[in-house]
């Protein structure tokens, strides 16, 4: 009957599967018109999530030298999915084997026109700029060998940037006082930014311009009568203040109107000038 032939034709037509946008399209063309059997490992490899739409993923920004404090990229220029959409391999790049999140995402609005500002083009201050894309073909096992000199240059540039502006050492006063006490009125006040060291003691008696700073140091003024009395007292004690002369020194300072350390510094400064003139 014609009806039997019509029924046989309906039974031979394979059912058309309905696939969503998250699943791979069915494969046809096999014997019998059915779909290809799925391998056991593919059943659990599908993920539920949005597709790669909404923008393109450009160059890989993963730093492969972060462990040694450097910066080295693999040179991958654009993300290329390693598997079909909807699988776990779709999130892995077939070129650099990195996750899709390491690639710079370019939105659809900027896909037609180049982005005016790219985070990958930012070079740290003091670092040596390096080529973003490798001129050589990258092999899966040796892509880091070409960037070793970039890693060394980046590490050297980072060290130079950190130590390129060395801080000036703190100025410390000289430890050799040469007989001068602390708080000397004649020693002068030296600014914190001036070079203070073993030569700071040579500024005594050198005049107002002897100090390394621009500030004029304080100098005690003596009258001629005070100079004559201090000269006579210095000759009497031998140009040195000893312990058994403390009472006489204190009495002399009260009479003349000078401090003890001022008298001591004056004797030290004039011992080699006024003392040598004596017969």
Curated annotation (Swiss-Prot):
PROSITE patterns: ZF_HD_DIMER. Residues 1-47, 168-190 are annotated as: Disordered. GO terms for biological process: regulation of DNA-templated transcription. Its main location: nucleus. The record marks 267 as: Required for DNA-binding. Residues 215-278 bind DNA. It comes from the Eukaryota. Pfam families: ZF-HD_dimer. It is found in: Nucleus. Putative transcription factor. NCBIfam families: homeo_ZF_HD, ZF_HD_prot_N. This is Zinc-finger homeodomain protein 1. The lineage of its organism: Eukaryota, Viridiplantae, Streptophyta, Embryophyta, Tracheophyta. The gene is ZHD1.
